Every structure is written in structure tokens, then in C-alpha cells.
UniProtKB/Swiss-Prot annotation:
The gene is GATA1. This is Erythroid transcription factor. Residues 211-224 have a biased composition (Basic residues). The modification N6-acetyllysine is found at residues 151-152, 158, 214, 218, 220. Acetylated on Lys-158, Lys-214, Lys-218 and Lys-220 by EP300. Acetylation increases DNA binding and stimulates transcriptional activity. GO terms for molecular function: DNA-binding transcription factor activity, RNA polymerase II-specific; RNA polymerase II cis-regulatory region sequence-specific DNA binding; transcription coactivator binding; zinc ion binding.
């Protein structure tokens, strides 16, 4: 491998190695290298061979390697390095020491409700800190959030001093309003809604009458007349099982199915058994007259 010397001396005037380089290469102080030595002088072409060859033509191995601090860098490496005393990059300024961490959070307090913990701190128009709830309320309503929550509205049935404008009662399960907007009790309101007239005062009662809601009997099963078992036959109406009269005998069982007639069997024609057609005939077939065959009864002849 060969390198081109960027700033080397002229090809005709080789420069002797210094004393330290001569000691490293095994030469005497101030002694110049020869062509057959460990390292040849600069060739006329200006190229330097960095492969040290010994006199015998084999690769020579140095016996002592100086530390990296004592070895001077080549001349072409100095051209690539920035000048000393200048920052590594023109746009980069002086390096500041890294801080150990973010500054501790200062103690904050909401100027409206005095809260010290909130998921998000906000500011009012004057720059004071507000908690998230007070800040949102001030942003939407334009005023500070009230510190005392307003009480819930009283139920209509528990309003004190409410009197029915028709019957003058103050006890009802539900307050209604008349077409004129006056409060009326539940009874007077329903009566006017159904009849379009005011409820007469003679119908007023001191107590509140509630309706007893009964469970509808539509879902219940109706028992058949006679008190028998609901499962009865649809034909004669006589109950089946033990729910009927024990003195009556049980119905007779249904007749058993009659076997198929033999003449109908012969009129069917060929019969399929196990995937084969077996025609009826007299020649050694299924009903044939041969050995092991079946003989038709007298008076009946198989039909083909």
C-alpha cells in the first residue's frame, strides 16, 4: 500500500531521519538510510513506501514501539485538524456545564380557593395563579368561581308554603300547574286535565288516597271445568292419566300394524338389495326353483 506525501520535501533532496526516528529504526544517530536498508529514502517520484523490508527481503518487525504520545503525527494530518484555540464548529459557542436537573418547582397557590395541588396551573388577567377548576370557571363565566357550592333546588313536593289554588291543600304527592300557571295539587290537576273543569271542593279529602295496584291475572293459566288435569285429549275430551275418573277403564291400545301382504310383495317387481337388482324369475334367482331357491306358494306366480 502506498500513500502520496502531500507536503513532503523535494524528490532530489531526501531529508535524513531525526535521532529518535533513527533509534526507532535501529540506526545510529544521524545515520542516513540506504536503498537496501530498513526504510528507503524518498523516491524521485515523491512517494513514500510504508512497508519496511529488511536486507534479506523479508518483513522486518520492530523490537520496540514508542508510546503514542511520543510519535509525531504525519504532516498531512495537521492539515485536516482545525487550528488550535478555535471552537470545534463556527456556530457553536462555549460549552456550558450541564445542570444536575430541572430547578425545583416553586410553591404555588390558587389566589381564589387556596389550592396548592392541581393538574394544570392557569393565570387570571392580572397574572396570578389559578388552579385548573378556578381558571376554567373564570374563562367561561368571566368571574371568580364561588367557594361555597349552591344548595340543590328543593323538590317540588317539599316546597314550604305552596298551597293548591283550587282546594287550598298543602299536602300532595306531586305539584302541578293550572292553565293559568297557578300551582295545584295532583288530584285537582288530573281532574282538570280529564274534565276541563276545576275539581269540586266536596271531593276534597284530608288524607291522600293511594291506588292499590294488583297483579294482572292474565298470565295465570285457567283450569279446565271439572277440576281435572289440564292435559286432556282433544278428541273425546276424556283426560289421560290419573286425573280422570278411576272407575272408568283405560282406553284400549292402538292396533298393531298389519304385516305387508304377500301378493303386494310379488307385485313390486325387481327389488334392490345391497346395490344389486334381483329380478324375480324361475332360473336360480332369489325366488327361483333351483337348489337353495325359494318356491312361490301355489296359486301365486311372480310377476316380472
Amino acid at each position: 500500500m502506498e500513500f502520496v506525501a502531500l507536503g513532503g520535501p523535494d524528490a532530489g533532496s531526501p531529508t535524513p531521519f531525526p535521532d529518535e526516528a533513527g533509534a526507532f529504526l535501529g540506526l545510529g544517530g544521524g545515520e542516513r538510510t540506504e536503498a537496501g536498508g530498513l526504510l528507503a529514502s524518498y523516491p524521485p517520484s515523491g512517494r513514500v513506501s510504508l512497508v519496511p523490508w529488511a536486507d534479506t527481503g523479508t518483513l522486518g518487525t520492530p523490537q520496540w514501539v514508542p508510546p503514542a504520545t511520543q510519535m509525531e503525527p504525519p504532516h498531512y494530518l495537521e492539515l485536516l485538524q482545525p487550528p488550535r484555540g478555535s471552537p470545534p464548529h463556527p456556530s457553536s459557542g462555549p460549552l456550558l456545564p450541564l445542570s444536575s436537573g430541572p430547578p425545583p418547582c416553586e410553591a404555588r397557590e390558587c389566589v381564589n380557593c387556596g389550592a396548592t395541588a392541581t393538574p394544570l396551573w392557569r393565570r387570571d388577567g392580572t397574572g396570578h395563579y389559578l388552579c385548573n377548576a378556578c381558571g376554567l370557571y373564570h374563562r367561561l363565566n368571566g368571574q371568580n368561581r364561588p367557594l361555597i357550592r349552591p344548595k340543590k333546588r328543593l323538590l317540588v313536593s317539599k316546597r314550604a308554603g305552596t298551597v293548591c289554588s283550587n282546594c287550598q291543600t298543602s299536602t300532595t304527592t306531586l305539584w302541578r300547574r293550572s292553565p293559568m300557571g297557578d300551582p295545584v295539587c295532583n288530584a285537582c290537576g288530573l281532574y282538570y286535565k280529564l274534565h276541563q273543569v276545576n275539581r269540586p271542593l266536596t271531593m276534597r279529602k284530608d288524607g291522600i288516597q293511594t291506588r292499590n295496584r294488583k297483579v294482572s291475572s292474565k298470565g295465570k293459566k285457567r283450569r279446565p271445568p271439572g277440576g281435572g288435569n289440564p292435559s286432556a285429549t282433544a278428541g273425546g275430551g276424556a283426560p289421560m292419566g290419573g286425573g280422570g275418573d278411576p272407575s272408568m277403564p283405560p282406553p284400549p291400545p292402538p292396533p298393531a300394524a298389519a304385516p305387508p301382504q304377500s301378493d303386494a310383495l310379488y307385485a313390486l317387481g325387481p327389488v334392490v338389495l345391497s346395490g344389486h337388482f334381483l329380478p324375480f324369475g324361475n332360473s336360480g334367482g332369489f325366488f327361483g326353483g333351483g337348489a337353495g331357491g325359494y318356491t312361490a306358494p301355489p296359486g301365486l306366480s311372480p310377476q316380472i
